[in-house]
Amino acid sequence: MRKIHSVSCCFALLSTIFASAMPLLAQSRSDIVVPGTGVQLNQVGDDFEDETWDFIPNNPKSTEDIDENQRQPMGKSTNGRWYEGAKRGHPDIVKRVPTPPGGIPGSQGSMLMKSLYTGIPNRPSHKMHQDDFICNVQYRLGGTLKVSQSPNVTTRVFIPPLEEWENRNGPHFAFRAAVETTIMENKTKFLFSSKSQKDEVYWPGLFILRGTKQVEGKNVPYAYFRVRADRNGGDFLGPEIPVTGWWTLGLSFTPDGLVHYFARPGVEELRREDYIATSMPYGYRCEELRSFFYNVVN
């Protein structure tokens, strides 16, 4: 089923979001929240164990980022927990499948995401594009989560063997969040200028990439993480992925406005030693968590 080298695909299992039961009144810069800490918010996230789980694509998908065409209505899951990204559209295939070996003990269901035709439907560009699959957080909770509550998210992702990936270097998959801050925007009218506050949304996260390196004189493919983003908005290098199969990924957001990134092989809960990095992407101080989502890149 997965041996199509031009397809980017990944499985997701048990995506969850947590927050502290009460807002934290103070937190030092050195306090890093391990994803999986706090009270699990059962209104959002998914374990994909329901045998009736399904996704209604409502094709053709949105490509607003390319041609400003959303193609309403948006795709959505039948349980109301997931929806198509209005900016870039949903993966070509989103469906419930049997959990691959090595998943959480007792799990019977996972979500498969797979794309071959990213970009504008029926108009191949021969360029790299990405699809979005978004967890319905903000609407199901009735609002955003303030970073005073140290919200954090975890997911289990099955990374297929490298020989099953699309044969190109670069990003193939990502686990990201939509977060919000407040910025000052300069406005000019005639000869006068002014400043006003504006809500700004940005999307930090972990990308999974394919690369090649020299081993005994041969180019050998390998996988690694890149982190979005540093203070200037640039991605920076994360650790290599020494083994494929199941990985647990996590993001946390703390009252000091920082974003923290975690990953470990397997499906066990994240620990402090699984920490990758802390950043203030784009120089923005994070204020609220709106959602988390997956990218499939092709």
Where are each of the predicted segments found?
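Residue-level marker of positions within ordered structural domains that often coincide
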Residues: 8, 160, 254
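Positively charged n-region of N-terminal signal peptides that target proteins for export
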Residues: 1-4
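A short, polar/proline- and glycine-enriched secondary-structure boundary/capping micro-motif
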Residues: 271-275
